[in-house]
Amino acid sequence: MNHIIIHDRAGLNQFYAKVYAFVGLGIGLSALVSGLMLTVFQSQLVYLLMQGRLWLTIATFAELALVFVASSMASRNSPAALPVFLLYSVLNGFTLSFVVAFYTPGTVLSAFVSSALLFFVMAAVGIFTKKDLSGIGRAMMAALIGLLIAMVVNIFLASGFFDYMISVAMVLVFSGLIAWDNQKIRLAYEQSQGRVATGWVVSMALSIYLDFINLFLSILRIFGRND
């Protein structure tokens, strides 16, 4: 029995490592593209910013389309799921540069470090807790929908305080989702007895990637209120 437990634990650790390899690759690509836009292609970025929100709007809609395509391909275990996820990561790095450009490097670094620390804590909660987090996960998803509606409303209100409260709530929501999504990785492994299709690995990596990026953006808005 001990040998079986050790084997299962080793297999689960390898499975987490595989998921997080994809997550790390996605975040790395986004950071690389965003960094290049802010340095090597800074003049082009300034030009695009001066053109208004057209390019950002186009890129945002393209991102949404890629998320749906990647999720659909992952659910069908399509070999194209991983390339689409990586393409999304590249495009997201492009759009992130539009946001990050308005903050100081110190603020961006502080937000990233804080996001990483909070992410690792909540990921550990999801990985090691024995409590079923599905109820919390569903509540966080419902709260996220409400916050997205609030963000749309605040486009017209243009309230700085309202935006701050939304950002704080977003941090709480994505912290909960990070724990839940990490628990789902373990459950997927256990329920499939370690035979999880690559498409599902990509799907879980996409969820974790989105959790981290949105957590970072929420903390960045909080830290950068005075920038």
Which residues make up each language-model segment?
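A hydrophobic alpha-helical transmembrane-helix feature that marks the membrane cores
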Residues: 1-227
